[in-house]
Amino acid sequence: MNATPRILIAAQPHAGQVLQTMLGEIGDFIVVHTTADAFRVLEHQKIDLIVSTIAFDESRMLEFLVSVKGTASAAHIPFLCSRVVAGALRDSLVGSMGDACKACGAVDFIDVARMPPDLAQTAMRKAVATSLQ
């Protein structure tokens, strides 16, 4: 890919900042905090990748993923699911998120909240690079 990729980050404010820091200069980021804002961006801008966190828009990541994959103009955009900030979810639920995300059309689920910071950054950057290929 020659042009700088445009990455839509769908996350609560703190997680969006963490992702931008983690991903560095991998792309141009557009950060949104609600599903409505995300679809406005998708309607008016070319997006190469969507990265969403579990807690996006009051924990609507899966709902957003299903909506994106059901929208003809956006279904082709790779969608990467993640958990950036540890929360109240039980380990068993978080462990099932990867399967749920992939079943709904995501390319992967990266649980960076469980990883040491250096490994988390490496894993997320690798997942983004792979998703953009």
Task: Identify the function of each model-found stretch.
Residues 21-23, 41, 100:
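Alpha-helical interaction/dimerization surfaces of two-component signaling modules
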Residues 129-133:
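CheY-like receiver
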Residues 44-45, 69-76, 104:
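Conserved phosphotransfer cores of two-component systems
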Residues 13-33:
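Two-component/phosphorelay signaling modules centered on CheY-like receiver
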Residues 12, 33, 85-127:
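Output/docking surface of receiver
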Residues 51-72, 79, 83-85, 89-95:
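Conserved phosphotransfer microenvironments
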Residues 4-6:
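Nucleotide donor/acceptor-binding cores
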